[in-house]
Amino acid sequence: MKLEMICTGEEVLAGQIVDTNAAWFANTMMDQGIECQRRVTVGDRLEDLISVFRERSLEADIILVNGGLGPTSDDLSTEAMALAKGETLVENSIWRQRLEDWFARSGRVMAESNLKQALLPESAIMIDNPVGTACGFAVKFNRAWLFFTPGVPFEFKQMVHEQFIPFVKQRFDVSGDVALRKYLTLGQGESSLADTLDKIELPEGMTIGYRSSMPHIEIKLFARGIGAIDQLDTIETQIRLLLGNAIVADNKMSLAEEIHALLVDSDLSLSVAESCTGGMIVSQLISFSGSSSYLHQGLVTYCNESKVKVLGVKPETLDVHGAVSIATVEEMAKGARAILDSDFGLATSGIAGPTGGTDNKPVGTVAIALATKEGVYSQMIKLPRRSRDLVRSLSTAVAFDMLRRELLGQAVIVDYGSIGRFEK
């Protein structure tokens, strides 16, 4: 089966907005063992849309079309599909009623232009959009099925999961001999990882791919065919031996997702005190439902006074060692843990930049501590000073990995490769 994607919209084509839908879609389908083999972006011009629908429908088996289903004059995907196939547009009575009910429930008067969203090519199969007013639909044209979705990200993603993936599986054999394994890494760049893994001789039908999503690089091991699948365990063993501590999670999108799962299963609690990360640790954790079962509190103690008054950091510790120090961050972690008698206290304090660094503590210097009921683990690391956001996100990731390793009973302080460490 050959899957393709057509993205529509002048703002996407002109780079005025980043097309996150396309990247998300390709990654989501890869998780299903289905590769998106081509992606085309086209603007809001009727003749261009017609041309690309005709061209790609001769090559692909199924095409997901994203965008252009709204009520405005530049939403042209539906009209273009009808013209490409030589069909008229027909009002779908079910969707018209859905629109009228939706506006009635919201207490709003429906503008006449919204009825455009109920017009579909005459051969189209209506596809439900459970969270929006733009009607999805599917059309068989030449050799391909074209499946139309709205551009609004949360509508698009829900339709992919609830409508598109089942649609594909009903019509195509996607249970073929494919398998995917993913490894989330920390502390090494994409080129460094690739140089290391190039030493592995891959069997026919197996490929290694890389996806950068700072502060992580995701490695994807993709196998096609029984022969390649049978050798996945062998290749995975080689990958783990070569990368060692750089691998921080399997089949997860982020370290926060891994930490969330581990804490939910462990029945243990966490308090967090953040300075340079500014709430990033807690923000990532509470994006997951159920985080209240383990997260006691998140404190952003940015100034020295708050470190003293809220966390109980000794003034003399700050005077002697400074805010960015092992001594200070250990007291922050212990103080955060003690407030609610949490099982763990996690703390960060650093210099995110671009200003504030010194010769002894340059930008990118970050102290991190993990307090447990038995003691405290701490380290002061040297991070690349490319941007403030990168320092904060890398600090968050290292803090998460310290906690992950403690939860798994592993060594908490480890070397990652490109992340340096100050001697205590």
UniProtKB/Swiss-Prot annotation:
- Read off the SUPFAM superfamilies from this record: CinA-like, Molybdenum cofactor biosynthesis proteins
One matching Pfam family is MoCF_biosynth
Coiled-coil stretches: none
Return the Gene3D superfamilies for the record: CinA-like, MoaB/Mog-like domain
Q: Which SMART domains match?
A: MoCF_biosynth
What InterPro entries does the record point to? CinA, CinA-like_C, CinA_C, Competence-induced_CinA, MoaB/Mog-like_dom_sf, MoaB/Mog_dom
What HAMAP family does the record point to? CinA_B
Family statement drawn from the similarity comment of this UniProt entry: Belongs to the CinA family.
Q: Which PANTHER family match?
A: NICOTINAMIDE-NUCLEOTIDE AMIDOHYDROLASE PNCC, NMN AMIDOHYDROLASE-LIKE PROTEIN YFAY
Q: Which NCBIfam families match?
A: cinA_nterm, molyb_syn, PncC_domain
- This protein is called CinA-like protein
Record the organism: Shewanella halifaxensis (strain HAW-EB4)
